Amino acid sequence: MASDKQKAERAEVAARLAAEDLHDINKSGGADVTMYKVTERTTEHPPEQDRPGVIGSVFRAVQGTYEHARDAVVGKTHEAAESTKEGAQIASEKAVGAKDATVEKAKETADYTAEKVGEYKDYTVDKAKEAKDTTAEKAKETANYTADKAVEAKDKTAEKIGEYKDYAVDKAVEAKDKTAEKAKETANYTADKAKEAKDKTAEKVGEYKDYTVDKAVEARDYTAEKAIEAKDKTAEKTGEYKDYTVEKATEGKDVTVSKLGELKDSAVETAKRAMGFLSGKTEEAKGKAVETKDTAKENMEKAGEVTRQKMEEMRLEGKELKEEAGAKAQEASQKTRESTESGAQKAEETKDSAAVRGNEAKGTIFGALGNVTEAIKSKLTMPSDIVEETRAAREHGGTGRTVVEVKVEDSKPGKVATSLKASDQMTGQTFNDVGRMDDDARKDKGKL
């Protein structure tokens, strides 16, 4: 297929050459030669199976050129005849001459074309053979070149791989050395930092230790000072409460003795009056034994009732005073306990001492109150002989004495002091009120 196409191209080249030769002939003919216009036309080639051979194509091209030339000559003659009637003969003669010249030229062109076609054929064959040889040689060279390039590329690749391998090994060794160096530097840096942190920590620990010791000493001194203050204050309060309680107990004792003396004198006087009345009226009493007995009994009952009322009033007042004194004593005990607990919180070593002192003070207060109670009880208790006579008089009709019964109740510590204080307030004797318990402590604060 490629050879047929090449043949067609060569035929076209030959036709062009023939047309060029004809054009040259027309130019060299001079003024008398009629110019012929050769129109080149591309001929469509039939399908490959209907194509003629190379020679046939050449002859067909020559024949076409001849026909074109003839048509041109005939056309020119016809135009000349129509243009001017005068040059018709000349045009006919010229046309005949041109026709003969054209035929001759066509034959020459055919011979020349055949010769050229032969030359072109040989040239084409030579060129094809040469191209074939060149192609084979080029293919061989290309194969050799490719093989050389492949070998060269292989060698170059191997060389590059070796270079890369060496480069990688060098880089690995360099990285290893650099890593080891960095690790060593890091280890040294870490050791330095650890040592520095250790030194700094030791320094801080020493500072904190000294600071803690100083604070502990300050706290100890402060606690000891506060404990001493609390101890002194507790002792001072305990002494005040003790003195106040003793003073009140003494006052209560005196007042109680005075009151009991008055009651005793009143009872004795009443008894004397009754005895005098009974002795002076013996005769009358004998005559009016029953009346006298009833009167004496009534008088005794009245005296006993008065005495009971007085004692009941004193008992009620004593109960109130007892409650008030108990509240005061409890308040004093609570203050003592609070002071003791405060001293215990500030200084543990002084807790036991403060508690012991508080308990001693408390025991002293309650002991003093107990002694006062016993004294009052002993004063209020009637002698045993009077008790026996009174019992015998009740059983056998009388002993000639007027018996006054005094009911004595056992009271708790502090009741008497409270009762006496309430009695003083009822009778207007408020001049012995000492006022607030902590006034003296406030005035004397800082003297100890």
UniProtKB/Swiss-Prot annotation:
Gene3D superfamilies referenced in this protein's UniProt entry, alphabetically: 6.10.140.1430
Domain of life: Eukaryota
Keyword annotations from UniProtKB, A to Z: Coiled coil
Biased composition (Basic and acidic residues): 282-326, 334-354, 435-448
Coiled coil: 297-331
One Pfam short name: LEA_4
Keyword Nucleus: no
Induction of expression: By abscisic acid (ABA) in immature siliques.
Disordered as annotated region, ranges: 282-360, 411-448
Tissues in which the UniProt entry reports expression: Expressed in mature seeds.
Presence of keyword Coiled coil: yes
InterPro entries: ECP63-like_dom
Cellular component GO terms held in the UniProt record: cytosol
Biased composition (Polar residues): 420-432
Described purpose of this protein according to its UniProt entry: May be involved in the BHLH109-mediated regulation of somatic embryogenesis.
Similarity field: Belongs to the LEA type 4 family.
Name recorded for this polypeptide: Late embryogenesis abundant protein ECP63
Organism of provenance: Arabidopsis thaliana (Mouse-ear cress)
Gene: ECP63
